[in-house]
């Protein structure tokens, strides 16, 4: 029978519940169990697709085209699995489904209520995640903090599951904060006690408490937390701040987190074999050189908006025994006069995705600077589009060339709306989303790094390169190295006489793994390392 683990959080948000859940998933997977994982977000949006990155951070896209929470990126990278639309559930999705059922008459004229209709729908999403993947264990992270009004139906649903399927099949892990009070020079357990008290008042007794802390906590403090929260002392797991995220699974294993889970759930499985993971952590802790990549974006004040991009850069760096630092460059501040200064000290330039006109001209300037000065360059989504616009303007001489998204009246719409998008009115969930094939041209840099004729990558866009300009651009040395199999859509562009100038319409960052870097990132970082070594 499938087992269900729920990870909740207390005291404050952004405690790292997602990292704890992902780390546990990795440990259980390495014990030979089939693990899947999901995130429940209590906000009323149907998904984060239309939310500002300043509000939510990155939107992570799955193979099947779901626009999801950035924690799913952590899950995929840590556990090395591909998730799907059942892996992210929001209040908006649940209410939308229940209201559709009510309109169809599925409830036979009954009064639709939070209990049982909303809670039943929530439980169904948990069960479905297990059925769709045939999982031995489903880990569900509940977003937000215990005590939030929005979280109450979620907590009630997971409370009910203990009665529905039995105590040994359900487990609750609660993440809390033990803050350090600098003036007193002490760690304080009271917030944890109150958080657990709040959770217990809702009918949930945590089996394990994971304590986030700036510094090690004493055994006496663990005993105190165990006493007040009514759990075994060994079930108080310390999670100290770490410089290297990938060390956390090993720290949790050292304290027996996965063993506690297996004992409670009567899971007969081998010890977690973590030698490959230990090699990764050892490598990350002992990198021999450092390079700096300039990231030119519009959301640089919030690094979480580019979290998968940054992680992918780091993964690629590991392959070259290199620590990759990121220099954040606000695209709105970039001009022809200051680009050299803003990118000084960098060994490569990356222009990631984005929407809207803010900062686009700065990205075009940065792209031109990389092209003209033989600086390794990687463009993603909008980054590919601005690379195309820049080339059209400054090499082909098409003054005023632009994207129809930004300048609908441009004489040279190098980037235009996808034909199938012309009648679309809604913004949410209507982009070209998910995994699509890309056919690579032999003899190109893209083919060289992928070593494959057809590759599959994840997309999130509404605009595309305008084929009316394709021949004209090709004649001037612009290389279309990847297209859709029918040749209709441009997927990758590059330049021949350049150390590395490659850009993709898709989002390669969504498929990178710490032990298996994504090929375009690996090629980009390889060129950047070479450039750094030649200085």
From Swiss-Prot:
Q: How is its activity regulated?
A: Allosterically activated by GTP, when glutamine is the substrate; GTP has no effect on the reaction when ammonia is the substrate. The allosteric effector GTP functions by stabilizing the protein conformation that binds the tetrahedral intermediate(s) formed during glutamine hydrolysis. Inhibited by the product CTP, via allosteric rather than competitive inhibition.
Question: Looking at the UniProt record for this protein, which Gene Ontology cellular component terms does it annotate, in alphabetical order?
Answer: cytosol
Pfam families the UniProt entry points to: CTP_synth_N (PF06418), GATase (PF00117)
User: Which residues carry out catalysis?
Assistant: 381, 507, 509
Q: What sequence ranges are listed for the domain Glutamine amidotransferase type-1?
A: 292-534
Q: Quote the InterPro entries the UniProt record gives.
A: Class_I_gatase-like, CTP_synthase, CTP_synthase_N, GATASE, GATase1_CTP_Synthase, P-loop_NTPase
Catalysis: reaction(s) = UTP + L-glutamine + ATP + H2O = CTP + L-glutamate + ADP + phosphate + 2 H(+); L-glutamine + H2O = L-glutamate + NH4(+); UTP + NH4(+) + ATP = CTP + ADP + phosphate + 2 H(+)
Region: Amidoligase domain; residue ranges are 1-267
Binding annotation for Mg(2+): 71, 141
**Pathway assigned in UniProt:** Pyrimidine metabolism; CTP biosynthesis via de novo pathway; CTP from UDP: step 2/2
Q: A Gene Ontology molecular-function term?
A: ATP binding
Q: What is the protein named? A: CTP synthase
Which source organism does the UniProt entry give?
A: Bacillus subtilis (strain 168)
Q: Which lineage do the record's taxonomy fields give for this organism?
A: Bacteria, Bacillati, Bacillota, Bacilli, Bacillales
């Amino acid at each position: 029978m499938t087992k269900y683990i729920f990870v909740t959080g207390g005291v404050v948000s952004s405690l790292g519940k997602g990292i704890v859940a992902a780390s546990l998933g990795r440990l259980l997977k390495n014990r030979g169990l089939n693990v899947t994982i999901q995130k429940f977000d209590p906000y009323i949006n149907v998904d984060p697709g239309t939310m500002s990155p300043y509000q939510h951070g990155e939107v992570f896209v799955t193979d099947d085209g779901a626009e999801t929470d950035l924690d799913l990126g952590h899950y995929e990278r840590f556990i090395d699995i591909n998730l799907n639309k059942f892996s992210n559930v929001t209040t908006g999705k649940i209410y939308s489904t229940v209201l559709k059922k009510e309109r169809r008459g599925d409830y036979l004229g009954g009064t639709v209520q939070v209990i049982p209709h909303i809670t039943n729908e929530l439980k169904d999403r948990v069960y479905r995640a297990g059925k769709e993947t045939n999982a031995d264990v489903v880990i569900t992270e509940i977003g937000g903090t215990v005590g939030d009004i929005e979280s109450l139906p979620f907590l009630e649903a997971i409370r009910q599951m203990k009665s529905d399927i039995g105590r040994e099949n359900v487990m609750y892990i609660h993440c809390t904060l033990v803050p350090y009070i600098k003036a007193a020079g002490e760690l304080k357990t009271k917030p944890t006690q109150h958080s657990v008290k709040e959770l217990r008042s809702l009918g949930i007794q945590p089996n394990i408490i994971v304590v986030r802390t700036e510094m090690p906590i004493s055994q006496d403090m663990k005993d105190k937390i165990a006493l007040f929260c009514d759990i075994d002392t060994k079930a108080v797991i310390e999670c100290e701040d770490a410089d290297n995220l990938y060390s956390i699974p090993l720290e949790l294993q050292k304290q027996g987190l996965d063993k506690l889970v297996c004992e409670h759930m009567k899971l007969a499985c081998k010890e977690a074999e973590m030698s490959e993971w230990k090699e990764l952590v050892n490598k990350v802790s002992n990198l021999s050189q450092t390079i700096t990549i300039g990231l030119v974006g519009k959301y640089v004040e919030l690094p979480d908006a580019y979290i998968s991009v940054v992680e992918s850069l780091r993964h690629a760096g590991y392959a070259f025994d290199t620590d990759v630092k990121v220099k954040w460059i606000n695209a709105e501040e970039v001009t022809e006069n200051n680009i050299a200064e803003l990118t000084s000290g960098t060994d490569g330039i990356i222009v990631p995705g984005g929407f809207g006109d803010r900062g686009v001209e700065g990205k075009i300037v940065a792209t031109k600077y990389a092209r003209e000065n033989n600086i390794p360059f990687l463009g993603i989504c909008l980054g590919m589009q601005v690379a195309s616009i820049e080339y059209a303007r400054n090499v082909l001489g098409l003054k005023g060339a632009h994207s129809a998204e930004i300048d609908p009246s441009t004489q040279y719409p190098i980037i235009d709306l996808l034909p199938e998008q012309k009648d679309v009115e809604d913004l949410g969930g209507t982009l070209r989303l998910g995994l699509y094939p890309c056919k690579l041209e032999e003899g190109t840099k893209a083919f060289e790094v992928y070593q494959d004729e057809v590759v599959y990558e994840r997309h999130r866009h509404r605009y595309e390169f305008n084929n009316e300009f394709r021949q004209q651009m090709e004649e001037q040395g612009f290389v279309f190295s990847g297209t859709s199999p029918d040749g209709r859509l441009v997927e990758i562009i590059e330049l021949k006489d350049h150390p590395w100038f490659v850009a993709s319409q898709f989002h390669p960052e969504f498929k990178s793994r710490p032990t298996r870097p994504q090929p375009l990132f690996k090629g980009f970082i390889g060129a950047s390392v070479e450039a750094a070594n030649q200085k």
